[in-house]
Regions:
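Structured alpha-helical bundle/scaffold domains in large eukaryotic membrane-trafficking regulators
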Residues: 21, 25, 56-66, 102-105, ...
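Single conserved hydrophobic/aromatic residue that forms the stacking wall/gate
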Residues: 1-11
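Acidic/histidine-rich catalytic neighborhood
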Residues: 30-73, 111-135, 139-147
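C-terminal amphipathic alpha-helical interaction region
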Residues: 147, 163-275
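Short amphipathic alpha-helical segments with heptad-repeat character
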Residues: 45-48, 84, 91, 171
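Alpha-helical transition-metal enzyme core signature, strongest for iron centers
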Residues: 5, 47-58, 90-97, 130, ...
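Alpha-helix capping/hinge segments and adjacent helical runs
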Residues: 80-156, 244-269
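Glycine-rich cofactor-pocket loops
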Residues: 12-48, 63-80, 162-168, 182-199, ...
Length: 275
């Protein structure tokens, strides 16, 4: 459902941006559609790259689940690790994607005529049912990371490191994630502290996995383009989405992991502090 919300919204907002005339984009003629505006392009690319990353995560996780179903022990462990990311990270991003869809429409997006607001309302319930994202984050922190001393997390990080060794941006984020994981394990006995940063830990790891899978898609698209001109536009769009993710989305990991390593103390307040 998260994926379908995102995909439907991306296609509808792109269609609108290609036909809506408003303002004069820089270096464009009067009467150019709003897709000519730089920030509209940014919003559309953000929607597309995030949705493609979510879709990739769900597809890869489906394969892991099938292997787990027939008793593959490594897949069983990885399935458990990925589920809270699917539920937590993806549903948070669904809200962002649908909110961007409203933004592209401007004031028209806020009313019912365009349908953009309905997508946003539908996405808002996603982080609540099937367990709120706070529950998913605590599950990811305590049961899927701390309980096995980071075994599954470390294995996945090593796989990403090897697979993306030629991608400088992802390699840097793998190193940062490893550092963050070690910090969490060093503080494993302070459960109150870890509960204050579990959401950011989940989000940061989700963005890393998304970047890894987008890089896989980019490499596959480049390979196919070198072999044939078939589906050229589609393959080039995959490459653009992956490059956008590298430079616009991947840096979010630094934000989330800085919160993990520096931000718990300010949240560990007494109830009186909120009065």
């Amino acid at each position: 459902r998260t994926k379908s919300r995102g995909l439907g919204d991306v296609y509808k907002r792109q269609e609108y941006a290609n036909t809506r005339i408003q303002g004069i984009p820089i270096n464009r003629e009067k009467g150019t559609a709003i897709i000519g505006h730089g920030d509209v392009k940014r919003l559309l690319l953000s929607m597309r790259s995030l949705t493609e990353a979510m879709r990739a995560l769900i597809l890869v996780s489906s394969e892991v689940m099938e292997k787990a179903h027939v008793g593959d022990n490594k897949s069983i462990m990885r399935e458990g690790f990925l589920i809270p990311i699917i539920k937590g990270w993806s549903t948070e991003l669904a809200q962002e994607v649908t909110s961007n869809g409203v933004q592209i429409h401007g004031g028209m997006g806020f009313i019912e005529e365009t349908g953009a607001a309905q997508y946003m309302r539908d996405a808002r319930i996603l982080p609540i049912y099937e367990g709120t994202n706070a529950i998913q984050a605590n599950d990811f922190m305590f049961r899927k990371t701390v309980r096995d001393n980071g075994k599954v997390a470390k294995e996945l990080l090593e796989e990403i490191k090897i697979d993306c060794e030629d991608n400088i941006e992802i390699s840097e984020m793998v190193n940062l994630t490893t550092k963050t994981l070690n910090y969490i394990l060093e503080n494993r006995d302070d459960q109150e502290m870890l509960s204050c940063i579990s959401f950011d830990y989940l989000m940061g790891f989700g963005y890393l996995i998304g970047g890894w899978l987008m890089d896989k898609a980019k490499r596959s698209a480049n390979k196919k383009l070198s072999e044939s001109s078939k589906n050229e536009m589609f393959l080039k769009s995959k490459i653009i989405s992956a490059e956008f993710y590298d430079f616009h989305i991947l840096p979010r990991i630094e934000y989330h992991f800085k919160v993990v390593m520096k931000g718990a103390k300010v949240v560990q307040l007494t109830n009186d502090s909120f009065i």
